[in-house]
């Protein structure tokens, strides 16, 4: 037991002299590790006579606990001293400005959607929505694009099976609305659409807004006036606007609308036309009694023109250096 007393005395003395947590950890390994002094003493119990073993074991545990308590106390003391020293070395200049809270902003595509919706809402158009997973009927057939129609090849459609697809246009919302509502109808349908295309001016997912107006006296003159007012309000300029004859299966007559750019060139912004009589018949509306016009615009296209963005893909890369410009 004389050896035990010496080990305890040496341990307590070494702990008291320890100047940092690292040296204290080295002492812990020396006395309590796998080959530490107290570990070897416990292993030596097997050589002690059986009748003396409990008493000897109790003394070793008592000595071990004494050394452990000293080690724990010294560790707590050293950690407190280190923390106080660190706090004393760090100072806060209360005259410095505080850290600013970064505020987010709307995505440029969302800004455009809000502007378009606000303009047409003030003219009595309501927002209607439909499913992004659409059926062949609502995406094509009901819009006067039957299975054999060559216009289907232009859509680069994502198909799930023979009947279900990711919608290539929000026009299906027009069909669903006309099925459940009676004229007069005045709606807009903003939403995501999908086409299998990816380059500087195309992405597999993009946004469209379509307008539909159906009434007994809807005509192309109204359509032209509406779009003139919208484009000048959206771009906040007295733009020169032109309508070019075009072709869409679901409108007749059809037109594409251009605005004069600052470089003196015409820039295409949207498509429009009078709703085709076949489309009205497909939803049970008599084309001899009612007429209508429809407008389709690409949100990213409008946003690119308004903010002079040259690469459509910039809208979807989440680059804060780009997005912060629109706050």
Curated annotation (Swiss-Prot):
Catalytic activity: tRNA(Phe) + L-phenylalanine + ATP = L-phenylalanyl-tRNA(Phe) + AMP + diphosphate + H(+)
Positions bound to Mg(2+): 252
InterPro entries cross-referenced by the UniProt entry: aa-tRNA-synth_II (IPR006195), aa-tRNA-synth_II/BPL/LPL (IPR045864), Phe-tRNA-synth_IIc_asu (IPR004529), Phe-tRNA_ligase_II_N (IPR004188), Phe_tRNA_ligase_alpha1_bac (IPR022911), Phenylalanyl-tRNA_Synthase (IPR002319), tRNA-bd_arm (IPR010978)
Presence of keyword Cytoplasm: yes
EC number(s) stated in the UniProt entry for this protein: 6.1.1.20
CDD domains documented for this protein: PheRS_alpha_core
Cofactor descriptive note: Binds 2 magnesium ions per tetramer.
Keyword annotations: Aminoacyl-tRNA synthetase, ATP-binding, Cytoplasm, Ligase, Magnesium, Metal-binding, Nucleotide-binding, Protein biosynthesis
Cofactor: Mg(2+)
Intracellular or extracellular location(s): Cytoplasm
Record's GO cellular component terms: cytoplasm
GO term, biological process aspect, one: phenylalanyl-tRNA aminoacylation
PANTHER family tied to this protein: PHENYLALANINE--TRNA LIGASE, MITOCHONDRIAL (PTHR11538:SF41), PHENYLALANYL-TRNA SYNTHETASE (PTHR11538)
Family stated for the protein in its record: Belongs to the class-II aminoacyl-tRNA synthetase family. Phe-tRNA synthetase alpha subunit type 1 subfamily.
Listed name of the protein: Phenylalanine--tRNA ligase alpha subunit
